[in-house]
Every structure is written in structure tokens, then in C-alpha cells.
Amino acid sequence: MATLELRNTSSVTPPVQLRNVVRQFGPQRVIDGLDLDIAAGEFVALLGASGSGKTTLLRTLAGLDDIDSGELRVPVARAAVFQEPRLMPWKSAWKNVVLGLRINDAKARAEAALTEVGLAHRLNAFPATLSGGEAQRVALARGLVREPKLLLLDEPFAALDALTRIRMHQLIIDLWRKHTPAVLLVTHDVDEAILLADRVIVLADGKLADDIRVDLPRQRDSGQAGFQSIRSRLLGLLGVKTQAADTATQEPARDVTLSALRRFANAR
């Protein structure tokens, strides 16, 4: 038996609860008896190999997919941002932001949301004229304008170049701090998960393989004490073997490059 409860009050804690949730396609259980809580205002990153159930879980939380059994409790006010911005090409940026909303002050609300993501000057721009990063920021504004208590992010940075990705990381953190939704970020990037999240959970075969608290001060950097130990643990859970030689040679070079990019992005 499946139970879905939509919550429209911010006083309920935690706003996201899953109890013994199952989602299956034919005989295959993609989500297999999952228990999970996400607290109000908590930023959770979700890792897992391809086919582990990450996107199915996000679609379930977004209301785009049903569960077969178990209990699922989520806020009514939810929004999802996907890897593809999914903008309507024949509508301007501001009309994409308020797509599907029936509100009197639609343009003003859209302009406020676009201002928050740094795109006030692109209010009337059409998707074909936007860069990849700009299009993704419009998609993010579309989520924000709905004032979600739960913001779902399905690999929204995967198609962006390194510098744009770092800027988007900082934008997401700034907006999360301002609006305080619970956030679930689906990603394949272990470093991204550690940099952004309060917790990192790992799915394997539709089950919770681990739930790791990231107790590192922000602003985070891969050179912080404790970062590499969390990284190694997560990579191990994902079946990636790390060798001392790799850590001593390849990773420092990568970390220096990423650190330099972050300094450059923050300086602009």
C-alpha cells in the first residue's frame, strides 16, 4: 500500500519523510524499501552509480512518479531544476519563469526572481539568445518564484563549463541561505557534493548505502582538513579505488586548478 501526504505548513519537521518506499518497474525494484528524512532548510546531496535509483527518487519527490508502496511525505511547495533547462523557445525569459503560474503580478515576480539570479537585464530575452549558464539560471529562477519548501536539483550543473559551474555553485549556496528551502541535489560529482551539502547520501540498488554528515566550515575547498577523507570514503562506496600515488600526484594538481578557478570566479 502506498501513502502520499502533501504538507502545506512550514512548521512540520522534517518536511520530507520516506518510510519503506518502494518503486518498481516490472520485477525490478528501483527504490527498495527506502527510509529517508530531510530536515527543513537542510542541503542534501545524493550520489550513486548509474541505475542506482537517484533520478527515480527525485522524480518521486517532485510528484512526477508514483510510489508502489510505503509512505512519502513532502511539502506542497516543491520545485525541480533539471540538467536541461527545459525552457519554452517561443517564450521570453520572464514568461518561462512564471510558466504555469496563475498570479496577477506575474511579470514583477518573474523580474524579482531573475534579479536574484543575476539576469534582470535578460528579462525579455528568448532562450535561443541565452548561454548555457544563463538558461540554467532562468530555470533556477522558475523554481524560486514558486517559493518552494523543497528544491530538487537533478544534475543542473553537469552541462556547464568549469568556471560557470563554480559560479553556479556559489549562486545556489547564496540562494539557499536566503530562502532556506530543503534541497536535494542529485550529482555524479563527489567533490561537488562535499562542497555544497550538509549531508551526502549514497544509493546502491535502490537502498541507502551510507549517510555522511559533512562537518566542514564554509567556504569549502578541497584542501580543507577532512575533505579528502570524506572524498575517499564516498569514492570507495561508489566502487572507485584510490591509490596513494594518485593522491600524491594527480589530485593536488586538480585541486590547485579548481581552487584557482574558484578564486577567479569569486573575484568577478
Swiss-Prot record:
Pfam families: ABC_tran. ATP binds at G48, A49, S50, G51, S52, G53, K54, T55. It is found in: Cell inner membrane. It catalyses: ATP + H2O + aliphatic sulfonate-[sulfonate-binding protein]Side 1 = ADP + phosphate + aliphatic sulfonateSide 2 + [sulfonate-binding protein]Side 1. It is a peripheral membrane protein. Its main location: membrane. One of its GO terms (molecular function) is ATP binding. PROSITE patterns: ABC_TRANSPORTER_1, ABC_TRANSPORTER_2, SSUB. Its EC number is 7.6.2.14. GO terms for cellular component: plasma membrane. InterPro entries: AAA+_ATPase, ABC_transporter-like_ATP-bd, ABC_transporter-like_CS, ABC_transporter_ATP-bind, P-loop_NTPase. Keywords: ATP-binding, Cell inner membrane, Cell membrane, Membrane, Nucleotide-binding, Translocase, Transport. Residues 16-230 form the ABC transporter domain. Part of the ABC transporter complex SsuABC involved in aliphatic sulfonates import. Responsible for energy coupling to the transport system. Belongs to the ABC transporter superfamily. Aliphatic sulfonates importer (TC 3.A.1.17.2) family. The complex is composed of two ATP-binding proteins (SsuB), two transmembrane proteins (SsuC) and a solute-binding protein (SsuA). This is Aliphatic sulfonates import ATP-binding protein SsuB 2. It comes from Pseudomonas savastanoi pv. phaseolicola (strain 1448A / Race 6). The gene is ssuB2.
